[in-house]
Amino acid sequence: MARARSRSRSYSPRPRDRSPPRERKGYDDNRLRERPSSRDHESSGPSGLLIRNLPLDARPNDLRDSFERFGPLKDIYLPRNYYTGEPRGFGFVKYRYAEDAAEAMKRMNHKVIGGREIAIVFAEENRKTPQEMRTTNGTSGRHGDYKRTSHRSPRRRYRSHSRSRSPPRRESRHSKVREDDLYSPRRRSRSISRSPLPRNEREYKSRNCRSPREERVLTPIRSRCLSRSRSRSLSR
């Protein structure tokens, strides 16, 4: 009897699970069947989308309902102003596979969401941190705009580097020497000697002709002196 009972227990049918089957998400099954091997690993193409001209009251669930049908999503992000908390009118959708992102951009570009026509482009892979968003939304200028300061700093370094290697100007060197010579006693004496003589001194020298240097250089004056001396001797 024990054996019969054990056999009856072993052959008793197990109750089946009558729970309803899980609903499958509305992915494009045809694309999944066509590329089973290529979707096993994540592709290297861009998988993030930047969605512009979104309504200000848009929520992540609104984008999920519109974009999740093209493939599994990794993230949905709607940036807001750091200080006011107001939405900025654009958002990011991150797919798991690059093929899904390309398909979503192809089909959803220029579609209407919330009464606005959206524009979709591929987004950069690196999302900004809250600190970067605070810097962008905050005061701009020397401390706020990091890109502007980093863009200007190499130009300043290049200018200073080129100035350090540039040869000194010759004009400044000669002008400095001339100024020093002008205030030196030797230069002062030369300038005095070369200055035009007063009228009385010229008449005196022309009459007496005592300067041998002027006799050698100024031949017309010497001839005049000789003629005047001869006229004086004859008159006497």
Curated annotation (Swiss-Prot):
Q: What is this protein called?
A: Serine/arginine-rich SC35-like splicing factor SCL28
Question: Family per UniProt?
Answer: Belongs to the splicing factor SR family. SCL subfamily.
- The gene designation is SCL28
Keyword annotations = mRNA processing, mRNA splicing, Nucleus, Phosphoprotein, RNA-binding, Spliceosome
Residues recorded with modification Phosphoserine: 184
The UniProt entry, under Pfam families, shows: RRM_1
Lineage of source species: Eukaryota, Viridiplantae, Streptophyta, Embryophyta, Tracheophyta
Q: What InterPro entries does UniProt report for this protein, alphabetically?
A: Nucleotide-bd_a/b_plait_sf, RBD_domain_sf, RBM, RRM_dom
Organism, by scientific name, is Arabidopsis thaliana (Mouse-ear cress)
Ranges of Basic and acidic residues composition bias in the record: 14-43, 199-217
Function comment: Involved in intron recognition and spliceosome assembly. Probably active at the 5' splice sites.
Quaternary data: Component of the spliceosome. Interacts with RS2Z33, CYP59, CYP63 and CYP95.
GO molecular-function terms, A-Z: RNA binding
Q: Where is the composition biased (Basic residues)?
A: 149-176
Cellular component GO terms held in the UniProt record: nuclear speck; spliceosomal complex
Q: Where in the cell is it found?
A: Nucleus speckle
Which GO terms are recorded in the biological process aspect for this UniProt protein?
mRNA splicing, via spliceosome
